[in-house]
């Protein structure tokens, strides 16, 4: 079953129309219809909005294995090492700073771990975006 088919099945199970689900997820009805017909592959943020509107986890729409495979396939071993090295640098910088606090209150270990998870997400996003960018001097301009 495709992502679009799962969304449609869950929407019908919840007795929602496309209009109702689109409003709850802040999407246009036509875009939702295109997703359900598998004309578009929705982004993670769109999937999160739809899942939230349906009251389910994103993994219920795409399946846990799909999320893990996509995340693992995105980076090779060198890139994973680079990310791990950068995260260690960030952790050391945070530990060096005197009185790590948020809004004047010292951060708990749980808050620091949460911050590190967010920072890892940022590093991975930046790595992925930079991977897509090709400097102009290296581009193949066949149109000229």
Curated annotation (Swiss-Prot):
The keyword Repressor applies. Residues 7-61 form the HTH cro/C1-type domain. Transmembrane segments: none annotated. Keywords: DNA-binding, Early protein, Repressor, Transcription, Transcription regulation. One of its GO terms (molecular function) is DNA-binding transcription factor activity. It comes from the Viruses. This is Immunity repressor protein.
